[in-house]
């Protein structure tokens, strides 16, 4: 539903940045107010990421006001905070479609707009990309400005510091803006810092500082005195000199909600030479009190009524797989003090809030540091503990070398609880958990499990925790099937599946067996009822139940594998590899995710589109048998 733009008269004048730059400066505060209200009213009707964007309204307006976008390049890290950017770059009337099938992409996306310089979704990539753009801008000699905007969470990742270390070394012109919403700043401190920012970024101070460095460079004691004096001056209000040690000229912190002061500072910094670092303080959820009080809860929101002070609760009586995992952690920790749970900044999403409160000494949030998370688990395992790394499928990609080098080679008892495996829905290409089976299946020593329901998930987590080597349990986003959950733990026999439905002779004379890996089992059973097929819940992707595969191959004419993973290199590919190794030549149909990046949509919409619901599975099998 598109909002009535006549209710936002100043915003109506700023459809694109070139329109924005024509507005008088005295109207920009009103523009920010209208932009924030528009964002709140739109996202509350459509769902999406809210709190981050509410906090970056003034920054977004200031950036597009000062810089000549899209010629000058803005690089947004992750992109949760880029909704105001989308509104101001010609996509205002489509904001209500964001994160929906065929709608606006949830993050900045190059195919969507010339103002989106980098397609993003994972964190901490912006400084590296911006530096690459800055290097090329210098090469082409067109005086193109490049700006990276990164949050205080994303900047903790090693990749961000690697990029800053390189930028400081080669001294290219670029600006990194740290959007720090961890704390609020008082009016006095904010005013003092805003004034200091004007001084430190101004041309007079810059020329004096650079000139003084040249004059005094041959007099080490005086040079050191000047340096220390400058640091003491800045140290009164600047939180440290770490960024300057990396080679950046640090300015800030400044109030990120004063649009006119931001514009002054950005104009001063725009033409400074070398790598610049602007530290701004913002409030996540700014302007909407419930989001200010609960920025985590309002980070990503369903449809809601802004007039109410709370978000609607889920109406499903079925637990999510994330909750199944969280309950397992608490129940298992009560029995095993050696259990250690690690997450790279995904406490809420991974279902670990309760565990973090009940077992704080066994809980470790390492921030956005997937590589460190995996190798931290390595150290714990070497010391005799039983670590569990709770991680989204898409983010495990970032710790792949550590999975091989630091865990699997040493055959250490580290379990990976892989959430959001398969299609996650609204977050699109960057977040679909499409590849974990493919990239883990080739690793020696790994045990890989794919539960068909929530009870099987619980027992597989226990199985992995008891295993003496590396293991992984991968499960999807969302609710379970409503299966009864047994409270007691039962370890599964590793590498053993089960037949859950036996077929009789099919109507066309061909006997079909469906080998289901994961939560498609319910759809497989619906299909089997329609075509009279055998169904096996394979449970283990590695090691495969080779005896069961041999049995199914001997008793059936066609095998069908189904998984919520890329077909290339996935579980079905493993079945074919085994059959070929045993010289068991027979027709095998692999169903799963196609060889393309899957865009956003609801999980049900995507399953239907890809032919992975019961109706689509039946059609694929019928078409295959008809060949």
UniProtKB/Swiss-Prot annotation:
Keyword Transferase included in the entry's annotation: yes
Lineage: superkingdom: Bacteria
InterPro entries, sorted: Dxylulose-5-P_synthase, THDP-binding, Transketo_C/PFOR_II, Transketolase-like_Pyr-bd, Transketolase_BS, Transketolase_C, Transketolase_CS
Entry keyword annotation includes Transport: no
Keywords attached to this entry: Isoprene biosynthesis, Magnesium, Metal-binding, Thiamine biosynthesis, Thiamine pyrophosphate, Transferase
One GO CC term on file: cytosol
A Gene Ontology BP annotation from the UniProt entry: terpenoid biosynthetic process
EC assignment: 2.2.1.7
UniProt-listed Pfam families: DXP_synthase_N, Transket_pyr, Transketolase_C
Top-level class of the enzyme under EC nomenclature: transferase
Protein known as: 1-deoxy-D-xylulose-5-phosphate synthase
Species this protein is from: Vibrio atlanticus (strain LGP32) (Vibrio splendidus (strain Mel32))
Organism phylogeny: Bacteria, Pseudomonadati, Pseudomonadota, Gammaproteobacteria, Vibrionales
